[in-house]
Every structure is written in C-alpha cells, then in structure tokens.
Amino acid sequence: MKSNLRILLVLVITTIITGIIWKTQDAKGDLSSNVQADFAIADTSLVNKIFIADNQGGTALLERSEESRFWTLNGEFIARKDATDLLLKTFTRIEVKGPVNEKMRETVIRNLAGTAKKVEIYQGGDRPVKTWYVGTSTPSHTGTYMVLETPEQGMSSEPFVVSLKGSIGFLTTRFFTDITEWRYTGVFDFPGRSLAEVTVIHHETPYHSYTIKSNPKGDISLENGAGAILAIRDTIKVQDRFLHFRKVHFESFNNHLTKAGQESIRNAFPAFTMLVKGFDGRSAKFDLFWKQTDSGPDEEYMYGLTTGGEVVLVQRYVFDPLIEVLSDF
C-alpha cells in the first residue's frame, strides 16, 4: 500500500511539473510571436532619429549626425554620447517579461494614459518604425510597464512588463526631456593622438603659466608663459598632464546662478584660461573663475565659461590637476 502511494505521489508531481513546463513554453511561444510585444530594434545602426515627449510638455529631439560621432539635440546642441548610446543599447536589449497581471491591467492602463513618456524611433522615414509608451516601474522595481505602437498594427491594447536582457531594474529614467541633462558637457575632446598643444594661463600669477606642445610622433616640449623653451625634468609627468586634456568634462549646465550672477561671471576676469589645439585645426578655450563662499574659494566647485559664453559648474577634483603650476614640472 505504501509503495502504491509513493508511485501515485510521484506520478502526480511529475504530471504537475510537466504541465507547468508545457504551459510556460507555450506562453513564451505565444509571446515571441505577438507583434504587440515586439519592442526591440534589431539593428540600431539604422536608427537616425529619436523623439521623446513627456506629459508636462517637455520634448527632446535627438538626430544622428553624419559628420560626427555625437548626436544633435533639438537641432541646436550636441547631445551626451553616453546617454544616446544608452538609448540604443536599450532599444536592442529590451525584452518582454510578460503581460500585465489581469488584476493590475486597468490600473496600469490608466496610469500609462496619464504619465507615460512617448518615445518615437525612426529609421530614415517620416514615420516612426516603433513608438514606445514608457510608464512607471513595477512594484518590485524589476520591470517597466510599456505599450507598443507600430504603423502596421497601430497602438497595442495590451500593456507589458519589460526589462533589459541580463539586468534587473526599470527603464523610465533613461527617457528624459530636460535639455540641460541631455546637453553634452565636454570641454575638450581630442581622441587618440589628435591633441597638438595645451596652454594654461594663470592670470593671477603669470609665472606659473605654461604651454605643452606635441608633434605627430608624440614628442613633447615645454614652454613657460613667455614662450621660452624649458628643459623637461620629468617627461612622464609632463606627458601625463598633456594627455589629461584629451577628454575633459564640466559638471553641469545648472550653475545655480541668477541671470545677473551669470552676467557678473562673464564680465569678470578669469583666474585661469585653458587653450587647447588639435592637429586637425580645431581649438577650444575654457575660462575658470573662483566660486566664492563666506570663507573663501569653494573647495569643491568653480565656475567655467565655455567658448560659446555659457557659465557652467565644474568640479575642482577634475580641474585642479589641469591647472598645476609650472614649477610642478
């Protein structure tokens, strides 16, 4: 009797497990063939335009440039490469975890209607190949509620829970419309061996100013502020300082200054000026100003003035090594 009970129990468990596996596989098969769940973009190299809109009226138009590795922002600015790369990565790695639970469906649809961000993805045509409606995260913060729209099928009536392959989290924060967050924060961008010359001017102590020059072979020379060539005591240190100028970013366009405060910076005399030139003829200038506090210069931040005349916030952690005095070499 006990033996028969064991056999019966094994058969029941086996049947249940087989049913679960069959049902799971069948559900996945149905989902993979469901055009309403086909969010992914197979070839992101064909994506040439992305339009993002939120429910507050904010928009961001990102367009691929044929002349640069950077995308343009609203036809006026340069977009952050890390942010556009993240979008393209999201487009290709997105996967559907499953449909929304029936009990949650109406609530999710209602929330999507009120808060979803619209993301249009273009591949050369006048109409988006796919439009995502990106909602909030799931209660567990391991997925995001989304709805798909395509020219062929229109807008899906079914919301899905999506995530990225190989990762856990939600996607909402990747799709933002704040222009200051989208704008490229690069001060200098001279990749590889394209950097030819760096000049750092210490306006308050001119004798600390210097220029480092390089030829296409990578040989460097050092000059003081008057243009006199100096002997290099530590070649590795000078080369290291020179190479630090290849890629430099400021902290933020949000400088926390009023318009009057910004104008005051523009009219002030800078503490430092950095001039950088490349072998391709490009050049860039960046001025630095002390950020004054009640106890003296701020220990963490300074103000910067871009070539285009915009006042930005910079981290001293990044820029202090770039304004070392000549005697340090």
Which role does the model predict for each range below?
Residues 1-329:
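Secondary-structure "cap/kink" motif recognition
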